[in-house]
Amino acid sequence: MLELVSVSHIYANGVRALDDVSLSIPRGMYGLLGPNGAGKSTLMRTIATLQTPTEGSIKFGNIDILQHPEELRRKLGYLPQDFGVYPRVSAYQMLDHLAVLKGIASSTERKSVVEGLLGQTNLWAHRNKALAGFSGGMRQRFGIAQALIGNPELIIVDEPTAGLDPEERNRFLNLLAGIGDNVVVILSTHIVDDVADLCPRMAVLANGRVQLEGKPSDLIASTRGKVWKKTIDHSELDDHQAKFEVISTRLFAGKTIIHVLSDSQPAGFEPVEGGLEDVYFSTLSTLRRAA
């Protein structure tokens, strides 16, 4: 269990990136959903001991990670949003080098670990290829391979599917699902479907605060009977936004489909089965209206 209590982080320029964040994250896949600039990457870096919060405490099991960050690092696998590699080095060589840095001194043990990870991430056929020649999806799979060195108990992946094509995204999410049963895996993303497809529990982070937390199914149930849709001309959008709590819009065949949140059915609207996307957008809409 990962426990965060009243974690805040204020940068030197006065920006409060995290504001009183408290979370209990159990074993399994946990989704952290939020827009760009919500504070997700700051929170991931803080949990990964790359920066110290201004206030609050973080514990992983019996480890106080603020007091003993080196203990957490021995149990941590981290795939940041952006990571660099030596472009002319092969995947095999790079994983072997990283395994040495992780403390695996035995060449026989490293060989077993590296070959196993290359197979697990479906990169064995590309083991001798220079990393510079990897596609975006292959780079992300390499990233999770390096994060799995040393059998970590806590794995953090930050925006892992951004920029991947649908096939690579599905392959990567299937890989995550396969490792998420016995360890804590935090999936930080702005892509709703990533969380909906994988995570038994989730939180919505926006403006540096936890706005919503729970099981996706429970959060979806909270909007049941409250989400309505209507197809309008784009020229009518401003008028509808003034009259209703519009939580999402999308273009389809030259028309605009809007979803609104209302306790009763507005005239001209039809009911729609709400999903996690409606929960997410309604949360952000409420914040915008309160600003």
Say what each PLM segment does.
Residues 56-67, 71-72:
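Conserved ABC transporter NBD signature motif
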Residues 2, 17-18, 73:
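Conserved structural motif at the start of ABC-family nucleotide-binding domains
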Residues 155-159, 164:
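Catalytic Walker B motif of ABC-type/P-loop ATPase nucleotide-binding domains
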Residues 171-259:
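ABC transporter nucleotide-binding domain
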Residues 48:
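Helix-to-loop junction immediately C-terminal to a conserved catalytic motif
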Residues 96, 100-103, 108-126:
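Conserved ABC ATPase "signature" region
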Residues 35-39:
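Walker A (P-loop) phosphate-binding loop of ABC-type ATPase nucleotide-binding domains
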